[in-house]
Amino acid sequence: MNTIPSSNYLSSCPNCGRVISAERLYKGSVCSECLEEDREFNSIRELVNELSRLNKLNRLNYIKEVLREYDIFVELFKRIIGFPPFGPQKSWIIRVLRKESFAIIAPPGLGKTTFGIITSLYFSSKNFRSILIFPTRSLVKQAVDRISMYSNKTNIETKLLYYHSGINESQKQELYKALNAGDFNIFIATNRFFIDKINELKNIKYDFMFVDDVDTALKSSKSAETILNLAGFSKDDILSVKELLRKSREDESVYTKIQEIRGNKLKGKTIVFSSATLTRGNPVLSALMGFRPGSSVIYLRKIIDTYAYLPNNDDDVVNLLKELLNKLGEGGLIFVPVDKGQEYAKFLEAKLSDSFNVVTITSSNTNKIEDFANGNIYALIGSATHYGILVRGIDIPWRVKYAIFVGIPKFKFKIGEVMNLVALSRILSMIGLITKDQDIVRLAGRVRGKLRKLSPAAISMLTNQAREGKLEDETLLRAYEVVNKYLEDKDILKKIAELGDLVISNGYILMPDYLTYIQASGRTSRIYGGELTTGLSVLLIDDINLFNILNRKLSLILDEIIWQELQIKKNKIGSSDLTEIINKINEERERILKVKKEGEIEPSLQKVKTVLFIVESPNKAKTISNFFAKPSIRQLENIRAFETVLEDKILIVAATGGHVYDLTTQNIGIYGVEVQQQNSHFNFIPYYNTIKKCINGHQFTDFEQGNQCPKCHTTQIILDKTATIDALRKLALEADEILIGTDPDTEGEKIAWDIYLALKPFNSNIKRAEFHEVTRKAILQAINNPRPFNVNLVKSQIVRRIEDRWIGFKLSTKLQEDFWKEYCKNYNCKSEENKNLSAGRVQSPVLNWIVNRYDEYNANKTKIYYGSIKGIDELKFYVFKQNEKIRKNANIYVKIINTKVLEEEINPLPPYTTDTLLYDANQFYGISASETMKIAQDLFELGLITYHRTDSTRISNTGISIAEGYLKQIAGENYTKIFKPRSWGEGGAHEAIRPTRPLDVDQLRLLVDEGEIELAKKITRAHFLIYDLIFRRFITSQLVPLKVIKERIEYKICEDSNCNSELKTLQNYSEFITDIKLPIQLDYSKFLYLPTTRIIKNSIIKKLQETTGSTNAELVSKIQLTGSFVKSTVNLYTQAELVAEMKRKEIGRPSTYATIISTILKRGYVIESKKTKKLIPTQLGKEVNKYLNQKFSSFVSEERTRNLLQLMDMVEQGKQDYIQILKDIYYEIKSIR
């Protein structure tokens, strides 16, 4: 890393909260007031020890206490286990020592129970009390035995109490008495015991409570209430929180009130919940305990997906299954499609049982799963349905090795019969999308809302009620009615098949149940002890079309899935040896079983790390954390941390909410930048402070006296990024590694740099993660391939920000004071200063363009009249006002000179860059540049498009494969005739703006509506419009050239029927596109981009001939002039044209185009016309422009602005010294008088 840029951060010293230099933070140190010596520290421990030695500890004193107790804890841990705690355990220990209550959501084998037990012994050594709650009596017994063994190992005397079923009544009373008197160190019992005895036990005094397998503890509301009572919450507290949660949608401040209740009642208590897969959520418990549960749906999978073809008769199927079971060995799950029913499962069990010990699992014999787990059953058979017991209710990583699917998991129903509610919901949504009937769209929304609140078992029950004619729900009955009606329409059926990825065969509708495939195959690949096991899935294909649809759906959900053919006779999977694969899977299971049986964590678990992943946006944080499992959520200060699981990582994802620091407005140096000069040598030191926001939406860095907002003087401050830094520093202390994944541009690099410096004293292992799309694959690549920080990008941003501040503040002050006084004299307004006025290096030349263009427009205006031949409204004729005869309702004559049909080949345009997207969004839909950028930012953060601030047209191989996948989907094997892959550019990290999945807008809308793609925020019609533009432009960029069929009509316009006197017209021809042709017959309406007018399907030439009754090319028609408008030969700017001009003249950058236009509008210098969206300067704008050009033209000239931006680009590339540029700007502003 080259020399770091000088800067100072106010209120940021980790120890005293005063100003600290970037150099000291970079060295992991504190400010010079706290530590005179300027030296480097490699860890927070080293820093704290030095400050302690000098008696200078202040805010960091709490860390000294935590570290001291951490060392004691670790020593105890080592004495018991034989080696120190690993990544996540270190994090859990620190959180306990900070007296935080939290939930551990981690896979089996990461030592959660061990941690809980050792923590209770640690507290016992301090003479504190602990309660441990387990789901079963056998686990209570195991915990008692382990505590006894551990206390003997460590010589910790502990008074251990536990409840077991063998004690008599007098012993029970003695137990209750001891508990209520506090005469114990550790008490262990089952969850059931506490539910039954809560009245006797709710006043127990304790310091630490550990709830093992909290899923069991949350099975019922009574169970959850018991936990809350034990935590100290009363019934009134629970009722209050329920009421507050009802209001939370309208009023987020209720969470502050809940936090107060939590703080008051949990005082002095630390409560830890443990679960492998916390899927049950109790909103009140979550709110009061300060976390939200995650889920078991983990999309990480290390599965070899294989296929073979299902034989046509049952005997051959049985023989194939026997062969597979023999080759693959024990530990298999066999899934039968739900349409074949339990009878088929029982049939297979009977046929296979003569050779293997196999059992069909139903709700009545789930105890057999334990026999299977213990190795007493060879394989299990179950139903391939989303709510099947083997699909959802089994997690045995040491035993399950492979899954066999006897047919594709599917929904299958006869057209007209009662279908599964999940299928009903999907088809209803498709019908709404196809018909555009808002009643159906709303009905589909209500059905989805109902189903999302129901468990799989409840959905199954309602489906059965519908089939038996017992369904009473009016909404669902209406949904069945609508679907059955539309399924009788063959056109609708065809469109549903195209849109919804289903197969219609012999009067049946087949839909692949891809979520069941993911869940069921996922049983073979689980995380255990920091290792993601390898699994094998064998899919026996019974319908090739359905398989193709399944493959497409899985690719959308899993990013990538590779199918290999299983050749059982050749003992091959693809080109790999089947025996080698099975041996590898068996070795993994033996290793896991060894860990499980020995009950200890292997030292190899040291590779498991806690990783803090920091991004800007909460939406992006939520999107990323959802890629791997539904995350658990923690609230720290003003940020939410999403905790999720990777193979060997616990990932904590948190968001900064954009920039954390900005230049101070305090009276330091020149507008917050200190200038140091020694002879000809300069240094520029910007001073940064944390960003704040008041209740009225004003953003600032520095309070007025009395913690007031400097703009509106309120003391109601809703955001202070100091709290963000504090929260991130807490998380940094827990993490083994920190990755900062802010946007891949100069602003993103500066945010990352600021965070890096703020956290460096707390954790030295910090790197930069770069990604250009928010997809699972891209995020994993970024996590696994971090890079150093690019200080050149940081320096470039510093130059931009200082230049913007200096020029902006200097010129703005002139406008607000000097200019405004003069303006008010001329226009009779108050002569006080106007703080809304501003000027900037880029803003000012752009304003000048708008003013000049408006003047040119006015100077070249003329009136134009128009009319058309009766019956052909599409063909309009325009003439200039050139004499008194040309007026409204006057007649003129059109002589058709020639008509012809042309065929032209049009090469596709490249995919979007920022400027071209802004242009088209404004031209096609009238969406402003700033609104388009907000929408594109959302689409990027939600993982739907690549990074949107780019001037590159390059498309990666990944992008090309997305286009290929989509075209193959819609055109089948003929897609090669229309697909022409193009990269549109070479090298570089940035790509053009493109979709991240092969989904057109209708497919995306359907997946979002059905909840198959879960987005971190709701998207609007405008989001879909912009996505549609991006998708069309991208797909078209990968097509062969288009053949465009045009009709051209050439004519003269005259005053008389003989055309002796020709009139001046706008143009003497009209062209119409009547068709677009591709090499194959295809409906291109969903994916083709045309930068042109609409396609006229009916021939204008034919209409002309039919209307006039003549085929004569020399035809003369009399037409009436029906209207007029004023037109100039010079067009006013639209936002689209202004962006194109900025790009052409190299003024501004992709990240600033929208901001510049937005600022000019906000200042009132320009207004936008309502209908035509033209930009018109106001009187104020004209006068500001005149003032700036007269007095400061050299500072706001196009040439100077362009040169400066080029110099900043050179700083980014490391080709220019940023100090030299700042020196030039410094002299420049010094000359402003």
From Swiss-Prot:
Cofactors demanded by this protein: Zn(2+); Mg(2+)
Xref: Pfam families: DEAD, Topoisom_bac, Toprim, zf_Rg
UniProt-annotated binding residues for Zn(2+) 2: C694, H698, C709, C712
UniProt: Zn(2+) 1 binding residues: C13, C16, C31, C34
Gene Ontology CC: one annotated term: cytoplasm
Active-site residues annotated for this sequence: Y947
Catalytic activity: ATP + H2O = ADP + phosphate + H(+)
EC number: 5.6.2.-
Residue ranges, annotated region (Topoisomerase I): 606-1233
Alphabetical GO biological process terms: DNA topological change
Keyword ATP-binding appears in the UniProt entry: yes
EC primary class: isomerase
Cell compartments where the protein resides: Cytoplasm
Coiled-coil features, chain-numbered ranges: none
Segments carrying motif DEAD box: 212-215
PROSITE patterns associated with the record: HELICASE_ATP_BIND_1, TOPO_IA_2, TOPRIM, ZF_RG_C, ZF_RG_N
Zinc finger (RG C-terminal-type): 691-720
RG N-terminal-type zinc-finger residues: 1-41
More details: This enzyme is the only unique feature of hyperthermophilic bacteria/archaea known and seems to be essential for adaptation to life at high temperatures. It may play a role in stabilization of DNA at high temperatures.
The protein's assembly and partners: Monomer.
Domains: entry comment: Introduction of positive supercoils requires the cooperation of both domains. The helicase-like domain probably does not directly unwind DNA, but more likely acts by driving ATP-dependent conformational changes within the whole enzyme. A beta hairpin in the 'latch' region of the N-terminal domain plays a regulatory role in the enzyme, repressing topoisomerase activity in the absence of ATP and preventing the enzyme from acting as an ATP-independent relaxing enzyme; it also helps to coordinate nucleotide hydrolysis by the ATPase domain with the supercoiling activity of the topoisomerase domain.
The family this protein is said to belong to: In the N-terminal section; belongs to the DEAD box helicase family. DDVD subfamily. In the C-terminal section; belongs to the type IA topoisomerase family.
Name of the protein in its database record: Reverse gyrase 2
Native source organism of the sequence: Sulfurisphaera tokodaii (strain DSM 16993 / JCM 10545 / NBRC 100140 / 7) (Sulfolobus tokodaii)
Gene: rgy2
